[in-house]
Amino acid sequence: MQGHLPAFLPDVHEIREDAADYLGECLAVDQGIGILLDELSRKDVLENTLFVVSGDHGIPGMPRAKCNLYDIGCEVALAARWPGHIKPGRVVDDFVNLMDLAPTFCEAGGIAPPETMTSTSLIPLLESPASGQIDSSRDFVVTGRERHVHVARDGYLPYPQRSLRTKDFIYIVNFEPDRWPMGDPEGLDDPSTPAPEYEQLAYNTMVAYADLDASPTKAWMIHHREEHDVEPLYQLAFGKRPREELYDLIHDPHYMRNVAEDPAYANVRKTMQERLFQILQEQNDPRLMEQPCRYELEPYAGPLAEFQLPPSKQSK
């Protein structure tokens, strides 16, 4: 793993080991997929099954990953097998959203998707014999975030973000830049504050920066946050962020240099902003269209209510 970590992670043994553990989990998932395929084959239905594999978010417990709108937080694997429909060995470059899977399964099963589904079936992409970019309109994807851990910030406040990702750029709007993106630091923004015990940070998400899952990487970075080489990476991971972020992924694949205020990128920023806000308006996104936004208020924000099944659903 040495020399292969993203540039925003310290290349030290503890973090390499944490990353290797994650890759080990990926291998375990791969083995599990093999078992499922074998079972479908044993039941003689494999050749008549649309089999799709993906994930729900990026790497947990890693800075800038899960619970962030950077690639390592949103980009997931997506592989599909459907004999007679999908030509094997193809790689498709179109941007898709996992919401697209629901109408895809509806179409594959011969039923019309409900009108409430605003996503688009992937069947044309799956059945195309081509690789690369197939549908020219799928040249972007929009992602968003409101909350992860409900107590991450004082007052149960979310950290609202929306982003537009294209082939060469990612543009992010942080609607409340005065809030802490990874949750309140519990004093750790002050270098003189002693760090909690390493084991606490590695295994208890709620100790500090609760929107970043507990992990050895989180613990190591907090314990070494004052070191000269670590402090800039610590700020990228845990510090407050400006309202707008723009990254040139061709020259900055690990999104380390925010060029939103760079005059050389003014036209790109304007184009990305206008396109993102147009999409959010078309979707009637409450974060853009409402004042106050409903996501700041209960039941979307606030303490978790105790959930109880209605009497008709409770076991007798």
In which residue ranges do the predicted regions lie?
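Histidine-centered active-site microenvironments of extracellular/periplasmic hydrolases
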Residues: 39-90, 94-97, 118, 134-136, ...
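C-terminal cap/loop subdomain of S1 sulfatases and analogous C-terminal strand-loop tails that border
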Residues: 59-60, 109-245
